[in-house]
Amino acid sequence: MIKAVVGANWGDEGKGKITDMLAKEAEIIVRFQGGANAGHTIVNNYGKFALHTLPSGVFYSHTTSVIGNGVALNIPVLIKELNEIVSKGVPAPKIKISDRAQMVMPYHILFDQYEEERLGGKSFGSTKSGIAPFYSDKYAKIGFQVNELFDDEHLKEKLKSVCETKNILLEHLYHKPQLNPDEIYAELMEYKKMVEPYVCDTSAFLWNAIQEGKEILLEGQLGSLKDPDHGIYPMVTSSSTLAGYGAVGAGVPPYEIKKIVTVCKAYSSAVGAGAFVSEIFGDEADELRRRGGDGGEFGATTGRPRRMGWFDCVASRYGCRMQGTTDVAFTVLDVLGYLDEIPVCTAYEVDGKEIHDFPNTSILEKAKPVLKTLPGWKCDIRGIKKYEDLPENCRNYIEFVEKEIGFPITMISNGPGRDDIIYRNK
């Protein structure tokens, strides 16, 4: 059976922990989209890790980790992560890389930086990981698949052609130094040595695993509101963040994805520019940011302070719907234990009217939050294992959110560790 773990919101919902937890029962973990532009934080017996490319299941010796064809593969980042976890005592994981995965090229990161510089104050808040230039090339059909590393003559010819085009942009738009195809070729030969032991037809591998009845987990990146079609465009990422794309990015039949665990944070946070209706500011935001996440709310990739807000029922309901949610994992609930009262955004006000459906970006930018305040529980809930042992006000908060979003909350995370979880049967 295939399960997917995906995000309901802007990313940073705690997917890494939930994937790490569900990986205990899985035999194969697959990254199916995105690149090193977002990090998943894992806390386990080996320490604390921020993974950007490796699937979160690499800490279990019984699992195989797959980098699917939909991933923007930054090979040096992948190998650096692999070496780092092994150096900290983690047994060398079993890894397979799709021969159809496309590579983040050295110049993609440069073009990302140059474009952000050119846009100045109108930039998209990119992590400068080369993601937008990578996907631009992928869909312009001038990207490089991993399998092309093994066809020397073709690779040299294609590099020469692509560099000619790129150099026109570098000279006339960005006024930056030109690319040298021979230097890039030499770098790619280093990449080839790094990945050669892992490259295979991962789609065929997964198909065989499905036939054998193996448990497969698809690990998504970011969240629904960062999807290029259904998110807050243009403040989105460049690949689909939805579970439905898991079939495409992993190379598996869509009907095999039977369970979709959508991870939803007990409050809101976002990195980068764009509309954020329930956002809070000043001391209130600083306090939540300081207490939040695992050691504070700062981006796992950039280290930037995350923007903070109250739980947004409108955005989360929409995010869960777009994912096709079967189960909600409700995370970082323990963080809210310091509050006397907890505001929740239940609707948006736009031009004097109340709306409950998540709108497109032009309307969203005019929206103001309609807040309902719930009583806090004023205690530490870490260490609690049973739902009925949570304080009454805490249970009321969970049940209020569940009713508002319309999807069952079956897992509650009440701490950063993999065992800080409460299962709730619905």
Each language-model region and where it sits:
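Non-transmembrane, aqueous-exposed alpha-helical and coiled segments at domain scale
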Residues: 1-426
